[in-house]
């Protein structure tokens, strides 16, 4: 997804990672790829503290277990707070469960709309949503979906739940859809 954004809509990344222009974004693709790769490794680090809940695959979660899951973004930032070089991932960790408009999701007190890395948070969030929704192994909260079903849900929520420009990019790029379908369903 990031590769397609960099090629087709680099203006969506202006402001992210300190880039102040499209030219700066285009001159530093590796900076974006490296940041997203590290973010993908770290964004759910708070789940390490609740592995016993995450691994409940045979039943629905209790309200207490759900509450602990909702706390994992903040728990993740606490894990990294003593490592100054990791602070750049803070917004990614906190924002990956917030809706695009910031009105839904958790943690409630994190304002993803104010983050300069908002678009990167959204790319990570959509990627995480796709991974979770298409996972057919070990889902305790629903049936796995295919990519087309996910894209339909994204389309219904564009502008509020999901970034309109990003979803329209997904909708309009058949090659990206094919690649994501393969990665999520066969790869």
Describe the role of every protein-language-model region.
Residues 74, 131-135, 155:
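A broad detector of the eukaryotic-type serine/threonine protein kinase catalytic domain
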Residues 121-135:
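Conserved beta-strand-loop-short alpha-helix elements that form
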Residues 14-40, 80-125, 140-143, 151-187:
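Histidine/acidic-rich helix-loop-helix segments that form or flank divalent-metal centers
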Residues 44-57, 97-106, 131:
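Acidic, Mg2+-coordinating active-site segments of isoprenoid diphosphate-utilizing enzymes
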Residues 1-70, 77-81:
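Acidic/His-rich, divalent-metal-binding segments that scaffold phosphate/diphosphate chemistry
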Residues 51-52, 136, 171:
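Short, function-defining helix-loop hinge/capping sites that tune catalysis or transport
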